[in-house]
Amino acid sequence: MPGWFKKAWYGLASLLSFSSFILIIVALVVPHWLSGKILCQTGVDLVNATDRELVKFIGDIYYGLFRGCKVRQCGLGGRQSQFTIFPHLVKELNAGLHVMILLLLFLALALALVSMGFAILNMIQVPYRAVSGPGGICLWNVLAGGVVALAIASFVAAVKFHDLTERIANFQEKLFQFVVVEEQYEESFWICVASASAHAANLVVVAISQIPLPEIKTKIEEATVTAEDILY
């Protein structure tokens, strides 16, 4: 059986892995990966708008991996519309990259549960195989954190190099052309970053759990026999 010191740290490692699992689920469900400002370029060109009038043509957009919302401002007031990524919008995006992001996050969910299971196993007993011990916990956390980091990097690539926001903003727009003037990563994106950070923190936790505690030795007093004791 592991000592109380290791049990405490392995328990913390299992909680961190479980928190990563929950964070990824939240990031998948909440449609707030990125928000931005979109300019109705067609409206600006039609009225030859000045700099002061541009604010009348700037709308808002936010989206996640499955759905989002857009507010069109084309000089006639804001018009809000909801949209879903699947099944039609994804065809206008880099579909392979978008699906890869989802698959990576689903894989990260499984790896987070595996790393949690290994931490619980080490908390209950001392595994007889090295791969099931602290090294195994580190391995699964490296894999889980790496997969989440790869999903984050893929999303950033889709935004920066594949004009993700602009493609979404112009989906099913036949009369108006929208241009992205501002982009900002939102809470779901940073939740994913926190998930990867939880696995990185687990590596530190496992390393701390291997620090040997100093043994507390009790000093045994030796019995002294005097001449008076012998006489008695």
Curated annotation (Swiss-Prot):
GO terms for biological process: auditory receptor cell stereocilium organization; sensory perception of sound; stereocilium maintenance. Keywords: Cell membrane, Cell projection, Deafness, Disease variant, Glycoprotein, Hearing, Membrane, Non-syndromic deafness, Transmembrane, Transmembrane helix. Glycans are attached at residue 48. Its main location: membrane. It comes from the Eukaryota. The keyword Zinc does not apply. The chain crosses the membrane at residues 10-30, 101-121, 139-159, 188-208. It is found in: Cell projection, Stereocilium membrane. The keyword Aminoacyl-tRNA synthetase does not apply. Belongs to the clarin family. This is Clarin-2. The lineage of its organism: Eukaryota, Metazoa, Chordata, Craniata, Vertebrata.
